[in-house]
Amino acid sequence: MAVPKKRTSISKKRIRKKNWKRKGYWTSLKAFSLGKSLSTGNSKSFFVQQNK
């Protein structure tokens, strides 16, 4: 017989939501930083071929 699960508490829900948002923030920050370093030519991890 199917039994409904207990409801997740609001505090647990907020913690999970905050972690999820924080992960997205750091990912976007890294992507922006990488894009910035590529555009200025200071990247040490990527070799971009320049068209002359």
UniProtKB/Swiss-Prot annotation:
<keyword id="KW-0150">Chloroplast</keyword>
<protein>
    <recommendedName>
        <fullName>Large ribosomal subunit protein bL32c</fullName>
    </recommendedName>
</protein>
<dbReference type="GO" id="GO:0015934">
    <property type="term" value="C:large ribosomal subunit"/>
</dbReference>
<dbReference type="GO" id="GO:0006412">
    <property type="term" value="P:translation"/>
</dbReference>
<keyword id="KW-0934">Plastid</keyword>
<dbReference type="InterPro" id="IPR002677">
    <property type="entry name" value="Ribosomal_bL32"/>
</dbReference>
<keyword id="KW-0689">Ribosomal protein</keyword>
<dbReference type="InterPro" id="IPR011332">
    <property type="entry name" value="Ribosomal_zn-bd"/>
</dbReference>
<dbReference type="GO" id="GO:0009507">
    <property type="term" value="C:chloroplast"/>
</dbReference>
<dbReference type="GO" id="GO:0003735">
    <property type="term" value="F:structural constituent of ribosome"/>
</dbReference>
<dbReference type="InterPro" id="IPR044958">
    <property type="entry name" value="Ribosomal_bL32_plant/cyanobact"/>
</dbReference>
<keyword id="KW-0687">Ribonucleoprotein</keyword>
<dbReference type="Pfam" id="PF01783">
    <property type="entry name" value="Ribosomal_L32p"/>
</dbReference>
<comment type="similarity">
    <text>Belongs to the bacterial ribosomal protein bL32 family.</text>
</comment>
